[in-house]
């Protein structure tokens, strides 16, 4: 199945993307090749092949919910450049520099 450059431009516009003409041509060619490869899967004979939903045999692995000793706060804050009231202080990211 051939993906046209017009289709690439249409999807790009919907996605609010812009591409040069050479990029549009490259995408159209590449996407056409990808679709052709996927269409080859329709030709594979899967008669008698069991449906596969997952390749992993693992089920949910549960563990006991047991409280454990945490890491020492002093050790956690050892390399923190700035702290305030037991919290790591970071530069303000809001325009006004105020509290969040």
Swiss-Prot record:
One of its GO terms (biological process) is translation. It catalyses: L-glutamyl-tRNA(Gln) + L-glutamine + ATP + H2O = L-glutaminyl-tRNA(Gln) + L-glutamate + ADP + phosphate + H(+); L-aspartyl-tRNA(Asn) + L-glutamine + ATP + H2O = L-asparaginyl-tRNA(Asn) + L-glutamate + ADP + phosphate + 2 H(+). Coiled coil: none annotated. It is an enzyme of class 6 (ligase). NCBIfam families: gatC. Heterotrimer of A, B and C subunits. This is Aspartyl/glutamyl-tRNA(Asn/Gln) amidotransferase subunit C. It comes from Streptococcus pyogenes serotype M49 (strain NZ131). The lineage of its organism: Bacteria, Bacillati, Bacillota, Bacilli, Lactobacillales.
């Amino acid at each position: 199945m051939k993906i046209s450059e017009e289709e690439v431009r249409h999807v790009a516009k919907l996605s609010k993307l812009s591409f040069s003409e050479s990029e549009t041509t490259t995408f159209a060619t590449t996407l056409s090749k990808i679709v052709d490869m996927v269409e080859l899967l329709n030709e594979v004979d899967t008669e008698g092949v069991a449906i596969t939903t997952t390749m992993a045999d693992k089920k949910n692995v549960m563990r006991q919910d047991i409280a454990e000793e945490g890491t020492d706060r002093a050790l956690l804050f050892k390399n923190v450049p700035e702290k305030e009231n037991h919290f790591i202080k970071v530069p303000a990211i809001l325009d006004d520099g105020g509290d969040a």
